UniProtKB/Swiss-Prot annotation:
Main location: membrane
Taxonomic lineage from the root: Bacteria, Bacillati, Actinomycetota, Actinomycetes, Mycobacteriales
Subunit structure: May form a complex with LbtA.
Gene3D superfamilies in the cross-refs: UbiA prenyltransferase
Species the sequence originates in: Dietzia sp. (strain CQ4)
Entry membrane topology: Multi-pass membrane protein
Span list, region Beta-cyclase: 1-140
GO cellular component annotations of the record: plasma membrane
Name by which UniProt lists this protein: C(50) beta-cyclic carotenoids biosynthesis protein LbtBC
Biological processes annotated in GO: carotenoid biosynthetic process
Family to which the UniProt record says this protein belongs: Belongs to the UbiA prenyltransferase family.
Function field: Involved in the biosynthesis of C(50) beta-cyclic carotenoids. The enzyme acts at both ends of the substrate, and catalyzes the conversion of lycopene to the C(45) intermediate dihydroisopentenyldehydrorhodopin (DH-IDR) and the conversion of isopentenyldehydrorhodopin (IDR) to the C(50) carotenoid dihydrobisanhydrobacterioruberin (DH-BABR).
One Pfam family named in its UniProt record: UbiA
GO molecular function: intramolecular lyase activity; lycopene beta cyclase activity; transferase activity, transferring alkyl or aryl (other than methyl) groups
Region (Elongase/hydratase): 141-432
Length: 432
């Protein structure tokens, strides 16, 4: 029988494998060689460090593992499962960075068809007299298959950001994993993201055409002919999971699941468009990532105590801050498309300060109200604070330069997730 710790590692390795396969397919020539060298070097260093520090801490009695929760395979006295995090970090971080900095797979020259992305739903056009240089008009040539389009639209780099909150909350509440935990994790890993980002890509089509950063890992430009198929695929892949989670869950978890599904639709869908209501846009975006944790906790029948609420509120503040900072880079394009956001209303500089305030508030809530070791997650917020603080002088005119900081978030999210995962594992495997 597979141990609990091993099962958790295998579940959380799914997005790592997905991103690695994506990098292997996407990268070519020197870029692939640099990626392989980066992965190999990071893997060697992290494996050595993990072996050394795990053996030291376990031998010193600082950490102890219940043998019934591990496979029993050890390197020295360190359980083999501990090395999964070294492997995940060594593979995932270089892969994400390589994808962010990769050159377009299809070259473009003046007077030839141009390409809008790095492998997303590729949209091509031939330049015509009088064209607006910032608007890309899609045509059918070069359009990828439907599955490829859906894959990119689901933002595979962000899958773990919604699956991990559910999985960790469920694991923390139950101390284990069963079929409900696995099904829930799979739902929040892929179908949930396809619905969330797919709906967004359909209803943000016009503004995305004007946004040059769309078309890569930061977001796809979804060809109009794929809109109906994307909406249908979103419904078909999510409804069976929703039905299962309602039937196997509690009344409380079902209500939270319904709220989560509504927030996914309401954020982008025509007639609701919460993303165009300043401040509600930040809160709804944050709820997209907090709600899986609430569902994971309540579907296990666990109580939402004061300490749990403190963690969830801090998570909401964290997510709202990240959304507000992310909106800064799109200020000019959103205004041109007559779209409202917390950044277009406040202005770039004020939005950055708003993000900073939310991060600080999250730290305060964790340190003041969250129980140990959950309060230790406050330290995972500090790199975000440092990143955003570098842009406190930004103006609307140069707001797009915050994109560099936003790209760092893609890596910081993984590092923060790693820290939170360690806290949860230590809570269940050690302190309990």
């Amino acid at each position: 029988m597979t141990s609990l710790y091993t099962t958790l590692n295998l579940t959380m390795s799914i997005p790592v494998v997905a991103v690695a396969l994506l990098a292997a397919w996407r990268l070519r020539g020197p870029e692939r060689r640099r990626w392989l060298i980066g992965v190999g070097g990071a893997l060697l260093i992290l494996m050595i460090l993990t072996a050394v520090f795990d053996n030291i801490m376990i031998s010193a009695g600082l950490v102890a593992y219940d043998d019934s929760l591990t496979s029993g395979i050890r390197l020295g006295v360190a359980p083999i499962e501990d090395f999964a995090y070294a492997v995940a970090a060594a593979v995932f971080v270089p892969s994400v960075w390589a994808l962010l900095t990769a050159s377009p797979r299809v070259g473009a020259e003046v007077g030839s068809p141009t390409v809008s992305g790095r492998g997303d739903a590729l949209l091509t056009r031939a330049p015509e007299p009088g064209d607006d240089d910032e608007v890309r008009t899609p045509e059918r040539p070069g359009t990828p298959g439907l599955l490829t389009t859906l894959f990119w639209s689901s933002r595979p780099v962000s899958w773990v950001n919604t699956a991990a909150p559910f999985a960790l909350a469920y694991f923390l509440a139950t101390g284990g994993f069963d079929l409900v935990g696995v099904i829930g994790t799979i739902f929040f890993l892929v179908p949930y993201n396809l619905a969330m980002y797919g709906i967004n890509d359909v209803f943000d089509y016009e503004s995305d055409l004007r946004n040059p950063r769309k078309g890569g890992v930061e977001g796809s430009v979804l060809e109009r002919s794929r809109h109906t198929a994307t909406l249908v695929a979103s419904a078909v892949t999510t409804v069976p999971f929703l039905v299962y989670l309602v039937l196997t869950g509690t009344v409380e978890s079902s209500l939270w699941l319904a709220a989560s599904a509504f927030a996914v639709i309401a954020y982008s869908a025509k007639g609701l468009r919460f993303k165009e209501i300043p401040f509600l846009d930040s809160l709804t975006s944050a709820f997209h990532f907090v709600s899986p944790a609430i569902v994971g906790w309540t579907i296990a029948g666990a109580e939402l105590t004061g300490g749990v609420w403190a963690c969830l509120i801090a998570f909401m503040l964290w997510g709202a801050a990240s959304q507000a900072f992310g909106a800064v880079q799109d200020v000019r394009f959103d205004r041109e498309a007559d779209l409202k956001s917390v950044a277009t209303v406040l202005g770039a500089r004020a939005a950055v300060w708003f993000a900073l305030a939310c991060y600080v508030a999250a730290v305060v809530v964790l340190l003041a109200a969250a129980p140990w070791p959950a309060s230790g997650a406050a330290f995972a917020i500090l790199p975000y604070l440092a990143t955003v603080a570098a842009y406190v002088g930004v103006t609307d005119a140069d707001a797009e330069r915050t994109n560099e900081g936003w790209k760092r978030f893609l890596v910081l999210n993984m590092l923060a997730g790693f820290c939170v995962t360690q806290i949860v594992l230590w809570s269940v495997l050690v302190w309990s």
